Amino acid sequence: LGGLHQSRNVTTVVTEVLVDADDASFQSPSKPIGGFMEEAEAREHEHADGWTVIEDSGRGWRRVVPSPRPREILEMEVIRQLVESGTVTIAAGGGGIPVVRDERNHYAGVEAVIDKDLAASLLARRLDADVFLISTAVPKVSLYYGTPEQQDLEEISVADARRYIAEGHFGRGSMLPKIEAMIEFVEATGREGVITDPAHLAAAAAGGAGTRIVA
């Protein structure tokens, strides 16, 4: 902002995100974290450290941890007030801090990683955002990514997105959670979402770049 001669306030909100203590992911870890490993190294961690490991999208082996779905953002009202005041607000970083609520209505942290895309989708819905943008490493969503048959997508419907998921086009540790986050936003609001890379964010916000996901 300084380089653009903008004088707007910027703040970061440490964000607690409520999850369900009975979420199935606590019994079936699914969120890839950390670097890629050879299978032998992954199996060693599995036996020695109790890790759950998977083969991830043909790129190698990774550890997976519980990733419960975000239900509510505890600091939502504060975030809303900051946004409405014109403050550039950074929230739900890394998916936020996962917490559960006990029978006494007290909150406690849990060992898990909330998917950052699903948390961002929840944040966008609670803020009643006009458009939901996700920045990633590629300018557009693709089918058959990384193959000679790669097909970049300009616009897809929610129905298209669900079909492509069923056909296995999107990797669990890469594009899949972004598409799922977009589906949630578009279905809940009727508005569009866009996925693109940082270089095309401004153009995407104006409708001129990226992959648009529509109802």
PLM features: residue spans?
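C-terminal catalytic "cap/lid" subdomain
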Residues: 1-215
